[in-house]
Amino acid sequence: MSEISNIINEPIGDRMKRFEAKYDFKIEPQNYFCVRLDGNKFSNFTRKFEKPYDVRFSQAMVMTTIDTINKFGARTGFTQSDEITLIFDKAIPDDFKKHITYNHLFNGRVSKLLSIVSSYVSVRFNHHFRLLTSNLTNIYSQETLELINGGTAIFDARILEFDENNKYEMLNHLIWRSVKDCYRNAVQTYAHHIFGPAKIKYLNREQMIQLIEENTNIVWSNIPLWQKYGVIIKKQLIKTDNVKNSVITSSFKVFSLKLSYNDTMLKFLFDKYFELDKISEYQLEDYPLSII
């Protein structure tokens, strides 16, 4: 009876906050983190889109990633297929001042980050994709357009946190999503589209590529990098000189490359702005699709 009395005497707000606190994890300000977002049940959503790649779907994903970097201050964005990865630097800078308190976005609260970022991505993707496909009845069926216009596409999200000693795993994570997963999907997507599932069921990637090149006019090395390795997005500064002075504005660099592990690329991921000379050893390919 005394325990019940204590509960009753505790303000209801405090009591509810105790229950909420059970899952109120925080990312430490000295740590790095990334948010990876995936389309929820997108295999059904994209079933009747253009094959092997729907360029408007890709554009919508890129534009959504740009919006999300702009909104939440991620250092680097990556997108392939129906997923987006956002890379965030540590909150405490190297030249920190002792009298200043540093925190991540939303004070590093994981529940806030997951819910707000996934909500924002869902809203922006539906907005962009609806605009890009508006009235394209020659490409999409009425049923598909109604599905797109319904704006019901949603994304889930997960967070990966890395301390200073594991910072390198951020690049490994991106290599996994790009060089491994995206590349595998590209090979399978083309092979499945051209030959169907039965003919490629027991083939490995090299055999699928050989089959494609021997039976079509496709040269695998000519396939766009954005299809094979996904798209990387970073802010960049643009200097414009006029008669009176120089003006510096910011825009976004949207490009693709084949990632590999080295310290140069790891540092590049956390740089605030894109600078070509910092990754000059890589072969870059600008994203070829017009971004409206």
Curated annotation (Swiss-Prot):
One of its GO terms (molecular function) is tRNA guanylyltransferase activity. Pfam families: Thg1 (PF04446). GO terms for biological process: tRNA modification. It comes from the Viruses. This is Uncharacterized protein R259. It comes from Acanthamoeba polyphaga mimivirus (APMV).
